[in-house]
């Protein structure tokens, strides 16, 4: 896992979800572990798209349920 991408994703997750940075691990799930609801998830995807200048289609966004999966998707772009 690219550490630089992970750190950027972590920063965005902490800002968007207002969670403790220590809780943001590659295995942390957005809904269960970090308390994101559906609106939080949409806003998080939009923030990631803007930060990394990518587009994440809705059908892909629905499968990204952990911090690690978000990083992997961004790495693949």
From Swiss-Prot:
Protein modification: 4'-phosphopantetheine is transferred from CoA to a specific serine of apo-ACP by AcpS. This modification is essential for activity because fatty acids are bound in thioester linkage to the sulfhydryl of the prosthetic group.
Entry's localization field: Cytoplasm
Keyword DNA repair: no
Pathway: Lipid metabolism; fatty acid biosynthesis
Coiled coil: none
Cellular component terms (Gene Ontology): cytosol; membrane
Key words of the record: Cytoplasm, Fatty acid biosynthesis, Fatty acid metabolism, Lipid biosynthesis, Lipid metabolism, Phosphopantetheine, Phosphoprotein
GO molecular function: acyl binding; acyl carrier activity
PANTHER family in the record: ACYL CARRIER PROTEIN, CARRIER DOMAIN-CONTAINING PROTEIN
HAMAP family found in the cross-reference section: Acyl_carrier
Full protein name: Acyl carrier protein
Native species: Synechocystis sp. (strain ATCC 27184 / PCC 6803 / Kazusa)
């Amino acid at each position: 896992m690219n550490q630089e991408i992970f750190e950027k994703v972590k920063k965005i997750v902490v800002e968007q979800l207002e969670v403790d940075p220590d809780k943001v691990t590659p295995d942390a799930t957005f809904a269960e572990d970090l308390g994101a609801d559906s609106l939080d998830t949409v806003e998080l995807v939009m923030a990631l798209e803007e930060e990394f200048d990518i587009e994440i289609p809705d059908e892909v966004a629905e499968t990204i349920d952990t911090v690690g999966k978000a990083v992997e998707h961004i790495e693949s772009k």
